[in-house]
Amino acid sequence: MAKILGLSFFYHDSAAALLVDGTPIAMAEEERFTRKKNDAKFPQNAVKFVLNKANLKPEDLDYVVFYEKPFLKLERIMKTNLSIFPLAPQVFIESTKNLFLKKIWIREIIFKNVGVPPEKILFSEHHLSHAASAFFLSPYEKSAILTVDGVGEWAVTTIGVGEGNNIKILKEIRFPHSLGLLYSALTAFLGFEVNEGEYKVMGMAPYGKPKYVNEIKKMINFFDDGSYALNMDYFSFDRSLKTPYSRKFIKLLGKPRNPKSKFFTRETGWPSYFGEKPQPEEYEKTAVEQERYADIAASIQAVHEEAVIRLANYLHRLTGLDKLCLGGGVALNSVANWKIIKNTPFKEIFIQPAAGDAGGSLGAALAVNHIALGNPRNFVLKNAYYGDSYSNEEIKEFLTKKKSKFRYFENEKELIDVVAEEIADGKVIGWLHGRFEWGPRALGSRSILADPRRPEMKDLVNTKIKFREPYRPFAPSVLAERAEEIFEMPKARNHFPARFMLYVVDVKEEKKKIVPAITHVDGTARPQLVFKEESPRYYKLIEKFNDLTGVPLVLNTSFNLKGEPIVNSPADAYSTFERSGLDMLVLENYVVYKTT
């Protein structure tokens, strides 16, 4: 019975995943414990958690696997650094120093922090880790595989085939020609943080029109085999520590957006929570400026979708398969994912919820288990609940120390009745139940819940509770068997990505007025399908809300404030509750009320 620990760290979203006999036992990102968003440090807390969950000690492990090969990465960075040394000596000095001080000493760092002997420490290639995390957890015996991200060692995109317990990479695109880094450059240009703000670009895009597609296509060349190449004259990510785009990029698209600027358009109007409305001349000028940035966001999203669809269509021509597994950070672009279903011959897609670098930890463990050790597959990932959990006894002790006003429910039905009634009455609820989610989405274990029927709920949750940008959409959690009534998603229950909020689909025309709080400006939503067998308490809550309102879904957003990771513990949840406009906090069987 192989016990394998997978690790990812030192880039962003460090994580640990434990595999026992081919089955994931526990998985978590380090940020959930340190409360530092996108924490890249060695995942000491996550390692401790996953081992404790399985009652294992380091000496019980058969292997510890790192999600990429440091010396292949060293080769790429050194060759890149040497090629740009005369132009950017500071980049050469800083990145080389960073490499030699820590990033190539992975075996020693794992030995020191985990305590396993060096011969038990293995390495998987970055994109193989992504491919393994996608394919080996899927329900498919054989499928096409597409991985796309910023950069691994050399590869930025791979296409391949998975069959049984093997993966064959057929082709790859290499650095610097990265679709992920193209999207990240536009993310930075639009005033957001790279490796964190890409989903904000996706949220801003529907407010604009793709007017700048031709300009962005000057930055990328498409070829008949689905591949592409960047025009590096527009980029500086290979030679700058500060900005990923060049002066030529700015000359083409204009002044970068100020990260502190307020986003609104003439169509949306000036949101009341922005404060005093500017004078007409300033209002018009600012609106036009922000609309231009929305148009640029819409344009990069359109070009990104075209690139992914081209790759997928070529992969289908190459393999003839109708099932596709997606991996890498680009697989978190839920708008593009659904476009693959609509615009290629692929009939089914599988994506695991932590498709980015955090999930590479799990993929590395899977690659060793199935490819290196030859163990057969025996597991399909149907939910994302692999984090830590807390007992009612622990919660009672915490709340008693806090001298909080709370109520305990012995009976689950009574608890659900009360919470569903509060949501239907317009209250916004913080909800903590069971093990926290693997990946960046809140899926009913660490969620903020509200009534999707109320149009004002979108602004209320954004500004008084989440303290975040007003253009960010909210997702619905819907009873799986009722999803097709609300969304344009035929055979909804068959779509695995919808379990993990990884598809954006159209809301049916006649339903948009019924659920305005989860309907984005372009008439779409990013639903989570909730299955009774996977999330029984959450399912019952939505079921009760449906009994009260006739609407089989609730508004669900991640339980965190702007700039913070999703909550892990009752203490995290309580802190967020105290610092926000949440009306009620549910911690397992305890309901906590605001004290006046």
Residue ranges and their predicted role:
Residues 1-5:
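Extreme N-terminal starter segment of soluble prokaryotic enzymes
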Residues 9-26, 34-37, 77-91, 98, ...:
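Flexible beta->alpha loop and helix N-cap segments adjacent to enzyme active/binding sites
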Residues 32-56, 308:
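N-terminal phosphate-binding loop and adjacent alpha-helix
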Residues 47, 54-57, 62-87:
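Glycine-rich nucleotide/cofactor/substrate-binding loop typically near the N-terminus or early
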Residues 48-62, 113-115, 312-319:
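Phosphate/pyrophosphate-binding loops at sites that engage ATP/ADP/AMP, CoA/4′-phosphopantetheine
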Residues 285-311:
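Adenine-nucleotide phosphate-binding core of ATP-dependent small-molecule kinases
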